[in-house]
Curated annotation (Swiss-Prot):
The keyword Zinc does not apply. Gene3D superfamilies: Mitochondrial glycoprotein (3.10.280.10). The modification Phosphothreonine is found at residue 210. This is Complement component 1 Q subcomponent-binding protein, mitochondrial. It is a peripheral membrane protein. The modification Phosphotyrosine is found at residue 184. Residues 165-209 are annotated as: Interaction with MAVS. The keyword Mitochondrion applies. It is found in: Mitochondrion matrix; Nucleus; Cell membrane; Secreted. The modification Phosphoserine is found at residues 197, 201. Changing residue 243 to W: Partially able to rescue mitochondrial respiratory chain defects observed in knockout mice. Residues 133-162 are annotated as: Disordered. The gene is C1qbp.
């Protein structure tokens, strides 16, 4: 009996030695789920039932077979065809192939979308600056819709550019320049039957240092919303005496509209060349 009892500790020790010989797995590793192979092809993960077109979106774009190395898609081809037709239509309805001239001996300087009109009168230099960007008034939903019998040219509303413009008046050897910020009120556009009405108005008036490229906000600016009407009328007469009147404003709209249409056609042509990668 005693030899048998002596064998028990030895057996237990051997068993414990066997347990310590095999390292135990960490608890964190046991809690992690075992990885399972994906049973669905990757190409079907983003495709909904009944959609046979979306699988093509997962494929990388293939360069053109012409060897240019550029990307040409069916959408680009349709886009180019649309732009080609659009350019033809815009050139067909273009009123002025060249920019119209202003009466009153105004000299025109154009730099992209910005234009300047310069004139000298009795020792004074008058400069009118405007930019055609965002100069097309929005089309309201309340406008009458064309009838079905009208032509496509008649259905297209005429694009009229009415930009804000700045008038600068500088005296000879003067250190200050009188600056008048003018704009076209929307309710005055097209009211040509009212002979006494001004088609443009003065919004702000200020003095700026002559020759400064940037205007200073620290200079006092007069807002005409709260201005005495007598003073406002004198300012309008001041501009009219220097050639900035209703006739000038009408011609400025015609010039700005022609310039805006010209730049729009150029933009369409550049966009077409960009899409074609030329």
């Amino acid at each position: 009996m005693l030899p048998l009892l002596r064998c028990v500790p030895r057996s237990l020790g051997a068993a414990s030695g066997l347990r310590t010989a095999i390292p135990a797995q960490p608890l964190r590793h046991l809690l992690q789920p075992a990885p399972r192979p994906c049973l669905r092809p990757f190409g079907l993960l983003s495709v909904r039932a009944g959609s046979a077109r979306r699988s093509g979106l997962l494929q990388p774009p293939v360069p053109c077979a012409c060897g240019c190395g550029a990307l040409h898609t069916e959408g680009d081809k349709a886009f180019v065809e649309f732009l080609t037709d659009e350019i033809k239509e815009e050139k067909k309805i273009q009123k002025h192939k060249s920019l119209p001239k202003m009466s009153g001996d105004w000299e025109l300087e154009v730099n992209g979308t910005e234009a300047k009109l310069l004139r000298k009168v009795a020792g004074e230099k008058i400069t009118v600056t405007f930019n055609i960007n965002n100069s097309i008034p929005p089309t309201f939903d309340g406008e009458e819709e064309p009838s079905q019998g009208q032509k496509a040219e008649e259905q297209e509303p005429e694009r009229t550019s009415t930009p804000n413009f700045v008038v600068e008046v500088t005296k000879t050897d003067g250190k200050k320049t009188l600056v008048l910020d003018c704009h076209y009120p929307e309710d005055e556009i097209g009211h040509e039957d009212e002979a006494e009405s001004d088609i443009f108005s003065i919004k702000e008036v200020s003095f700026q240092a002559t020759g400064d490229s940037e205007w200073r906000d620290t200079n006092y600016t007069l807002n005409t919303d709260s201005l005495d009407w007598a003073l406002y009328d004198h300012l309008m007469d001041f501009l009219a005496d220097r050639g900035v009147d209703n006739t000038f404003a009408d011609e400025l709209v015609e010039l700005s509209t022609a310039l805006e249409h010209q730049e729009y056609i150029t933009f369409l042509e550049d966009l077409k060349s960009f899409v074609k990668n030329q």
